[in-house]
Amino acid sequence: MSRIGKKPVVIPSGVTINVAAGNKVEVKGAKATLSKTFSTDVTFSVADNVATITLNNNSKNAVAQSGTARAILSNMVEGVSKGFERKLKIIGVGYRAKAQGNELNLTLGFSHPVVYKLPQGITAETPAPTEIILKGADKELLGKVASEIREYRKPEPYKGKGVRYEDEYVAKKEAKKK
């Protein structure tokens, strides 16, 4: 087994894990309910507020799947109990964002505003016109949404204008001189 796959997942109070046929795991908590179907190379067992993962065979793929399954299960448990948050910053003259219900209106220097429809389970806040805070229980979906929003206007290397993650560092280039 992998190092990560050997570690048990501690289940906090208020969170329940159900393992159904076909390795479908459902995690219920205060914030949300998440479900995912895992590889048949691993088996889940839940006892005494601890979930453990065991291998069905010792193939290289099964060993890799054990670590992946444990990490995903841990993220699901944390997501339904605490939730995840991703912050984006918008840098550029006239660049701004505004959250309206399940849509995010972005003005990013195009001739038209960009309207991004948020998927179910993800919420957006704009405490300032140049800040976006995305929240959700599903870490994978949250990262995908943040990546798609960033993709509209990636930070450019000369002035740094664009949409970036809050903790992202953009290496700046010097302009060409004649």
Swiss-Prot record:
Gene3D superfamilies with a match to the protein in the record: Ribosomal protein L6, alpha-beta domain
Keyword Ribosomal protein applies: yes
An example molecular function term from Gene Ontology annotations: rRNA binding
Protein origin, superkingdom: Bacteria
Keyword annotations: Ribonucleoprotein, Ribosomal protein, RNA-binding, rRNA-binding
Residue stretches spanning the membrane: none
InterPro entries according to UniProt: Ribosomal_uL6-like, Ribosomal_uL6-like_a/b-dom_sf, Ribosomal_uL6_a/b-dom, Ribosomal_uL6_bac-type, Ribosomal_uL6_CS
GO annotation, biological process: cytoplasmic translation
Ribonucleoprotein among keywords: yes
Extent of the signal sequence: none
PROSITE patterns linked to this entry: RIBOSOMAL_L6_1
Any one annotated GO CC term: cytosolic large ribosomal subunit
Function: This protein binds to the 23S rRNA, and is important in its secondary structure. It is located near the subunit interface in the base of the L7/L12 stalk, and near the tRNA binding site of the peptidyltransferase center.
HAMAP family listed in its UniProt record: Ribosomal_uL6_B (MF_01365_B)
Record's subunit section: Part of the 50S ribosomal subunit.
Family membership: Belongs to the universal ribosomal protein uL6 family.
Official protein name in the record: Large ribosomal subunit protein uL6
